């Protein structure tokens, strides 16, 4: 009688240990699966934002942004570069430089310094009025067409139709300017 009770309790303990081992493997698999899926959720989580001074909401995640976001950032960058006066040109250009990719900084800095020198020397005030924006989010290209009004000293404003192209990169939740230049002779 003692032998069969001992065998029976050994079998029960073996079944319990086997069940617990199986449960540990199942839980380990579940934790690994949750870690993988949560990582994707964290990095692909989208946030809808509607800023106070912009009339359309946009969607951003850590790795992607939609066309409305690129449109808003482009309007901000255009304002920093083109809506300037001798008093504001340095601070606007310095803030704009904080968004430029490190590889393009030296070249872009020279262009902005030349523009600032001309603006200060000729007492130029300018304002850009956007008429058309085309956003190509796949390659990060934004084409902007508009009217640039410039006042040189106290003279009447000169008006020119200009087209600018920006190359923007969005990574890690931050926008960088790859290029920002005027497009000429494009048909």
Swiss-Prot record:
Superkingdom of the organism of origin: Bacteria
Record-linked InterPro entries: Pilus_assembly_TraE
Keyword check for Mitochondrion: no
Keyword list, A-Z: Conjugation, Plasmid
Function: Involved in F pilus assembly.
Family stated for the protein in its record: Belongs to the TraE family.
Protein name: Protein TraE
